[in-house]
Amino acid sequence: MELFVEKDSIVREIWGKSDTVLFIFAGASAEFALNKAVDWLYFTGKLPSDPLGRLFSTVKYAKSIVFSPKDDANASIDVLRKIHGKVEQNRGTQIPDWAYRDVLFMLIHYSIASYELLETKLTYDEKEEVYNVFHRVGTRMGLSELPLNYKDWLPIRESHLKENLKQSKYTFDLFKQYKKHLGVLRYKVLIEAQKLVVPKHVKKELYLNDFSLLTIVIPIYKFSRNIKIDKFFKNILLPAKYKTEIKELDIHPG
């Protein structure tokens, strides 16, 4: 049975840990809010009405691709494309191709940044492997103009950040929704987490400084994993109604 991502792949290591995945989506939540195509997320109303539920459903989809046999993963990608196609049909216009690429680029960047923050620096080959996996996802979705390798992707990623991110009314509303659904303390943690993984251009657009209070906390959290109390911290940081979803983040299917 051919797997979409090999069992010894660094991508499985990254997406098999709940804390890494949570940092991936902390970063993506900041970048999403600035994307010039963020209005698409408001068209269905799902993200602003339940940002955490949307997060966990997206995680579930990503994990179903990373940890599945190749045929099943491709089928999941095809379904994802059909879902977006239906939204496009309902709105009567197409999601720009660059917007699809932006989402793919987020997954690449934050997979690498989050793992390096919480675990260890990745080798160039490992970064190339991360890029290759998501390149295959993008290719299956029919995206064009995808760089062939990680090295060629880096300057394209930088140009996407400068061209496609800008503050809008949706930016401020989305952060308002984050705060509403997380509460003041958890929202503060989200902001501090974003500071650690978002690119400089995102920080500039969101007026985020370089210092994060989590710089002090992360070494303590890493130690907590060694003595198996990290779940306690996760339960504190996320609302109780998402306990099942939090637990499932550490389940490695396939």
Feature-to-residue mapping (PLM):
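Mature, function-bearing regions of proteins
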Residues: 1-254
